[in-house]
């Protein structure tokens, strides 16, 4: 049995080097900026798996790769080769976790380049805020459309693409076979009393399929952006993320992520998931604070917070990378 202290185990786990249940070997978790690895990086993965592990690799839910069966003495040389390939080990702890994205970049349903946006979030918050300790893990997911393949609503902060349609009834000719009715995947389009097309806006998911369907262009795109859901939890207990309402640009989403993290650090109790913090504060009140810029005026103080009697964070003087 490997003889290392609990403090050493914790420190290694914080670097994505996790002791197995055999008490002897580790897995090494390798993180890509957006879940996408180049062929050169994949070759490196297979090489280090053979050289330093037992030759096996496993894929995780958050699109990271884990090298299996790594002896303790092989951990440091493995990490050096991973870093030389432009990747890092990690993805554990009470920090921003690896960012996941669906394949919206290449998917026929994708409304955005999700992998590029995930890379932007990764650089800013996984890398830049890596030393900012939070009450618990903080997971971010980027979805390209309302299909929600990457499950944004089960992440602490999730976004998914929106193409908001606008209807021009003057262009509608009451076609016997309406392409929009046939194309709508959620069946929120029907004929009204006068034969005109009626959209149930409450049921519409803003997938944008109707916009290209009508040959008379009776539907156009009014707005394109991201819906935002916060506080999703999937684990021992579950909580579906709360939609904060509205459609946001990438820049606006980046600012919302920053404010969400700051509010979580300020209001969360140690060991409390983000969704539980939201519920304790009150959903409406939390969303009000999130949409306001008030928390940004307290940013410096929040990043200096230590643990408090009510809970709070556990790191003093958190630093944000300028890189």
Regions found by a protein language model. Give the residues of each.
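C-terminal, charged low-complexity interaction regions
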Residues: 287-323
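Flexible, glycine/charged-enriched surface loops at secondary-structure junctions
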Residues: 54-61, 92-93, 131-137, 266-280, ...
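Small-residue-enriched alpha-helical segments and adjacent helix-cap loops
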Residues: 2-4, 26-177, 202-203, 316-323
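A glycine-rich phosphate-binding loop feature that marks nucleotide/adenosyl-phosphate handling sites
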Residues: 139-146, 275-286
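Iron-sulfur cluster-binding cysteine motifs and their immediate structural context
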Residues: 177-199, 209-225
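Intrinsically disordered, low-complexity polar/charged tails and linkers
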Residues: 1-25, 35
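Generic secondary-structure signature for well-ordered alpha-helical cores
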Residues: 47-54, 87, 126-130, 186-190, ...
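A hydrophobic, small-residue-rich beta->alpha segment in the mid-to-C-terminal subdomain
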Residues: 234-269
């Amino acid at each position: 049995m490997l003889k290392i202290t609990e403090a050493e185990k914790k420190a290694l786990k914080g670097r994505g080097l996790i002791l197995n249940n055999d008490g002897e070997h580790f897995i090494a978790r390798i993180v890509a900026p957006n879940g996408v690895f180049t062929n050169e990086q994949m070759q490196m993965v297979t090489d280090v798996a053979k050289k330093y592990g037992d030759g096996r690799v496993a894929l995780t839910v958050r699109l990271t790769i884990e090298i299996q069966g790594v002896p303790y003495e092989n951990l440091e040389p493995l990490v050096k080769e991973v870093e030389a390939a432009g990747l890092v080990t990690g993805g554990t702890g009470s920090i921003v976790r690896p960012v996941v994205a669906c394949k919206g970049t290449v998917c026929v349903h994708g409304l955005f380049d999700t992998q590029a946006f995930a890379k932007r979030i990764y650089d800013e918050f996984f890398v830049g805020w890596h030393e900012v300790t939070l009450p618990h893990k903080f997971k971010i997911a980027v979805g390209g459309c309302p299909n929600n393949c990457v499950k944004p609503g089960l992440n602490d902060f999730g976004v998914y693409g929106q193409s908001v349609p606008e209807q021009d009834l003057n262009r509608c000719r009451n076609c016997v076979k309406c392409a929009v009715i046939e194309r709508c995947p959620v069946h929120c389009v029907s004929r009204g009393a006068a034969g005109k097309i009626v959209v149930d806006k409450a049921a519409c998911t803003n997938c944008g399929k109707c916009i290209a369907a009508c040959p008379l262009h009776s539907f156009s795109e009014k707005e394109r952006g991201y819906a935002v859901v916060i506080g999703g939890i999937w684990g021992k207990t579950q909580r579906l993320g709360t939609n904060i309402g509205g459609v946001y640009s990438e820049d606006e989403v980046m600012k919302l992520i920053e404010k969400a993290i700051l509010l979580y650090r300020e209001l969360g109790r140690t060991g409390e998931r983000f969704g539980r913090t939201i519920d304790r504060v009150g959903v409406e009140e939390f969303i009000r604070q999130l949409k306001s810029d008030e928390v940004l005026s307290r940013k410096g103080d929040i990043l200096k917070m230590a643990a408090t009697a009510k809970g709070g964070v556990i790191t003093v003087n958190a630093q944000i990378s300028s890189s």
